[in-house]
């Protein structure tokens, strides 16, 4: 938060509890921001409000002042149980809940109020015990709170006096709306409690929720998205897909030491971008949905302290973050939703400061640009991708194959997949000849004349067993995934098993054969049934 004088309304001019006013002054808050000046007079009078304001405009302090002032000014119920909180604040993400808690403790921790922070990803039993001991204000994410609400002896909302929904539009985006309705139905009647709703956009679905669960809320709009984006210096580049990393590195080299956030649309590409920045020598942190909660908190703390230069994040992970001093925001991928664009660039230019937002519109995401420009009601200036901006990428080292040649670094798994794909297409990798120091004989034509059983996609290498005449030994092949015992046929979909004839004594080495070919004739000697039939015919001819 900041005490930057964005309005002339002083906190001392409001009807605040003396202890609360002292805490605000001690924390450095003297003048109100526009959203605070607009909402505090209405909310302090006990009215419900639906306020529209961007993150970083001071709305967190606005509803915290209302909550704390109400609890200090009005005594709680005498028969209130420890598990009955007087106030509830709901946030869509863990990071936002943590930041609200930290702000609440900053100026309200010495006022005799107990705050409880409830969110997933951390010790379940510890939080449950905290709720059982009692708290005046519960700051929570919906999912973990519902878990405790279903355990009736842990927490109850039957005497809750005031409820706050922060980032209400994000609740819809993350699919929490059913959870929110579940929680609101367990509060006292809407005429018996006060409800404050804050959202970056007061869309139809947000207002529908407000009118359904709030008591004649007053709609208050502090500023539109266009006003917010005018404080951000925006520009957009149109790079090819392969130019995005070099362009990002080139632009970052021109703003060394600046606190930067890079937004990527998917978790898969987050890792790739972060790896490229790390290899270029930057101190990088990754914030995505797969990062464990404790690690997320550590990363945010290090980024806030300046130990990390760049934070690469997805929209879900970074929504609602309150990080001061972010100078640059890069949209490595243009977002699909225009609202997400506004939320991204809102990480910079907070509380009246200036910032830079740089976007890349590649062929994959450029179609989002018209909607974004229509939403913010302005054209984003276009910058040219020049050769001077593209940083050269170092070529990866190539390993030697032992013969003086260099080979690409192909992982064994990728090689196995490639070999399997080629065999499924009937095109074996490589040509007959030396392989792993052993001679290889090319695959011959099918002995069944092309008819009969369908060939399988597996292959086996068979070799003569010199100790057993006429035995065929299937050996582990590249794409079989099965190790066979000597003298036994192995494979999928073999059907009826047949005895195989011995190999021609003139053959040597390895023969590449399918499992179907292993089971058919492989030499000139007749099978056992053939020899028996020949013997019977000979005996009949004697008579």
From Swiss-Prot:
EC number: 3.6.4.13
Subcellular location: Cytoplasm
Alphabetized GO MF terms: ATP binding; ATP hydrolysis activity; RNA binding; RNA helicase activity
Gene3D superfamilies (UniProt xref): P-loop containing nucleotide triphosphate hydrolases
Domain Helicase C-terminal stretches: 231-391
GO biological process, one term: RNA catabolic process
Signal peptide stretch: none
Entries under InterPro entries matching the protein: DEAD/DEAH_box_helicase_dom, DEAD_box_RNA_helicase, Helicase_ATP-bd, Helicase_C-like, P-loop_NTPase, RhlB, RNA-helicase_DEAD-box_CS, RNA_helicase_ATP-dep_RhlB
Domain of life: Bacteria
Assigned protein family: Belongs to the DEAD box helicase family. RhlB subfamily.
Stated name of the protein: ATP-dependent RNA helicase RhlB
């Amino acid at each position: 938060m900041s005490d930057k004088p964005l309005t002339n309304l002083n906190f001392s001019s409001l009807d605040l509890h003396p202890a609360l006013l002292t805490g605000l002054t001690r924390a450095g808050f003297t003048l109100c921001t526009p959203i605070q000046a607009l909402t505090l007079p209405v909310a302090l009078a006990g009215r419900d409000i639906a306020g529209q304001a961007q993150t970083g405009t001071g709305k967190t302090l606005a509803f915290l002042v209302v909550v704390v002032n109400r609890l200090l000014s009005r005594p709680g119920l005498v028969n209130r149980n420890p598990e009955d909180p007087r106030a509830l604040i709901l946030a869509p993400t863990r990071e936002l809940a943590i930041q609200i808690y930290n702000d609440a403790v900053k100026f309200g921790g010495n006022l005799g109020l107990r705050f409880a922070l409830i969110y997933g990803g951390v010790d379940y039993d510890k939080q449950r015990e905290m709720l059982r001991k009692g708290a005046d204000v519960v700051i929570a994410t919906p999912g973990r709170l519902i878990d405790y609400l279903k355990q009736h002896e842990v927490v109850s909302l039957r005497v809750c006096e005031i409820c706050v929904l922060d980032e209400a539009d994000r609740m819809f985006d993350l699919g929490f709306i059913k959870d929110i309705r579940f929680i609101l139905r367990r509060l006292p009647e809407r005429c018996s409690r006060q409800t404050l709703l804050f959202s970056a956009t007061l869309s139809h679905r947000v207002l529908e929720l407000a009118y359904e669960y709030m008591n004649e809320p007053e709609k208050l709009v502090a500023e539109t998205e266009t006003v917010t984006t005018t404080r951000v210096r925006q520009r957009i580049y149109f790079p090819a897909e392969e130019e995005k990393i070099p362009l990002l590195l080139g632009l970052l080299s021109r703003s060394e030491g600046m606190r930067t956030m890079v937004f990527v649309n998917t978790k898969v590409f987050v890792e790739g971008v972060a790896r490229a920045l790390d290899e270029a020598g930057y101190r990088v942190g990754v914030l995505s949905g797969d990062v464990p909660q404790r690690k997320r908190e550590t990363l945010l703390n290090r980024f806030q302290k300046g130990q990390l230069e760049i934070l690469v994040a997805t929209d879900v992970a970074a929504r609602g973050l309150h990080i001061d001093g972010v100078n640059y925001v890069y949209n490595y991928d243009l977002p699909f939703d225009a609202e997400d664009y506004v939320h991204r660039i809102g990480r910079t230019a907070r509380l009246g400061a200036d910032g830079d937002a740089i976007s890349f519109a590649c062929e994959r995401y450029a179609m989002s640009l018209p909607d974004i420009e229509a939403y913010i009601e302005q054209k984003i200036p276009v910058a040219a991708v020049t050769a001077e901006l593209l940083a050269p990428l170092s070529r990866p080292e190539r390993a030697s194959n032992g013969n003086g040649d260099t080979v690409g670094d192909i992982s064994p798994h990728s090689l196995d997949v490639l070999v399997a794909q080629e065999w499924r297409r009937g095109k074996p990798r490589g040509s007959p000849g030396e392989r792993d120091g052993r001679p290889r004989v090319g695959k011959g034509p099918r002995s069944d004349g092309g008819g009969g059983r369908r060939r399988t996609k597996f292959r086996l290498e068979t070799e003569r067993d010199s100790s057993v005449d006429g035995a065929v030994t299937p050996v582990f092949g590249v794409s079989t995934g099965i190790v066979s015992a000597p003298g036994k046929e192995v494979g999928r979909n073999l059907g009826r098993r047949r005895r195989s004839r011995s190999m021609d004594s003139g053959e040597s080495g390895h023969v590449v054969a399918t499992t179907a070919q292993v089971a058919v004739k492989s030499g000139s000697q007749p099978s056992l049934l053939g020899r028996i039939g020949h013997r019977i015919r000979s005996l009949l001819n004697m008579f």
